[in-house]
Amino acid sequence: MKITNFIFNWIVKEIMEQKIISIKYNAQILFFIIIPGILFSQGFDDTQLWHAEKFEKPINDKTSLALEQDFRIGENMTNLVYFHADFGIKRIINKTFSINLNFREVFEQKGPELTREHRPHGQIAWKRKLGLLAISSRARLEYRIRQDKDPFFRNRDMLSLKYGKGFTPLMLVPYVANEIFYDFKKSKLNRNRFFIGLNIGSIKSFKPTIYFLIQTGIENKEYSHIGILGFKLKF
């Protein structure tokens, strides 16, 4: 009887310990999702939900193909306002540099009008590690072919910082990033995106990312701000 009670008490203790650990992990996730989400819903011209899925298929150890689809729900997360499909090829030059050539088809709701855009683009990316800090950047040149408008080039430069190899058993890797947009047609910067997010490394079948994004538009010296909650799944 004593042995049975000992085993029962031990099982209960283990279950409670695991439950407490689970609650702590869930609380961490909720903190990163809910608190910034509440803050982001205040004082923005719009709040949006973005969801992207990216599929990569290696051809060899240096070359891979990629397919991406991206859905964006705007108007305070009530209507689908944007969708793109992107297909491309990536080539790793060395441990530091890689290049991409892609074609993107974009559909965007602008008021009552659904617009369509063809967007071929190329980019060069760079990455480096300094201890626990991973630094990466990329420069992308897009050629935007839009309905009933003259085509033009746009440049997008992004810098990202990741820290650590993974915290908690969920292997959470925090990061911050900033992306600037330069419109060659208008010869000026007209958009900025600031990201703060988490990569989740504990899932082996795919790589999920959760992030919060503030997008700032610049038009005629006036600023507009959109708060965005985003999810990206990489397979």
Regions found by a protein language model. Give the residues of each.
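Solvent-exposed loop/turn segments connecting transmembrane beta-strands
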Residues: 42-49, 73-82, 110-116, 145-153, ...
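Bacterial Sec-dependent N-terminal signal peptides
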Residues: 1-47, 235
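Outer-membrane beta-barrel "beta-signal"
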Residues: 121-124, 224-235
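Residue-level signature of outer-membrane beta-barrel architecture
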Residues: 57, 91, 126-128, 163-165, ...
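Repeated loop/turn-to-beta-strand initiation elements of outer-membrane beta-barrel proteins
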Residues: 62-67, 96-101, 131-135, 167-172, ...
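Transmembrane beta-strands of outer-membrane beta-barrel pores
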Residues: 69-75, 103-109, 128-130, 141-145, ...
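Detector for outer-membrane/organellar transmembrane beta-barrel domains
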Residues: 136-177
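Start-of-domain marker
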Residues: 43-93, 98
